Amino acid sequence: MTSTASHAFRYSTVDGEHRHELEIKRSRFITVLRRAETEEAARSLVAELRREFHDARHHCSAFVLGPDRMTQRSNDDGEPSGTAGAPMLEALLKGSAVDGEADLSDVAAVVVRYFGGILLGAGGLVRAYSESVSRALATAPLIWRERLRLMSVEAPHGSAGRLENDLRAFGISVVGTDDGPTATSLRLAIEDAERAGAAFQERLATLTGGGCVAVDLETSWVDVP
């Protein structure tokens, strides 16, 4: 299953691991959410929980990976088809950090079920697995992941300090400096979006009278608390 989301510059994810337990008609639903950036990491969580809860009847799972949520998987693990993994995945896809925007990714969810002796029916299972993940997400700590452009700007030694202060005053992150024989190289990080890049170039031209040029180095995803 794939997503048609547009190219992402920011998304939210779970900060570490989070657990939540729900009881429905004597069945225990233990939800474990964990940040996972690869399929291997997501499947490793399932394997770990099979060992930890080895006497449970079901270990159903779903995960969403990638800034654009391009990798989406789910597994019913013995529950009737479509009653566990799919509603879990749907709950993850509705996950968001703020403003109601569905942007949660790089997260794996496993719901461990201990059967309580009362059959829930297909509809009841769908609601139970969906609610288990939704409630876990409601209390899970989330963080932002932002894609930043790393850039380099060279300025003469005599004006580099002032330029650095001016850039910081504009809210531009200066992540490092390197002194060369005749100039200082400032390493900067800005939001990797077209409008942010254009605004930065305008500010740089204004601050330096067009005397400094920014050189793109690379892009990098970083955690933003």
What are these regions (language model features)?
Residues 142-159, 186-188:
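Short glycine-/aliphatic-rich beta-strand segments at the starts of folded cytosolic domains
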Residues 1-83, 195-202, 206-225:
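C-terminal regulatory domains involved in ligand/effector binding and gene-expression control
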Residues 154-174, 199:
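Short amphipathic alpha-helix segments
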Residues 64, 104-115:
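Glycine- and acidic-rich phosphate- and metal-coordinating loops
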Residues 122, 126-150:
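Long, charge-dense
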Residues 181-185:
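C-terminal binding/interaction regions
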Residues 38-39, 156-160, 189-198:
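Helix N-cap motif at beta-to-alpha junctions
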Residues 85-100, 139:
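Short, charged beta->alpha transition segments
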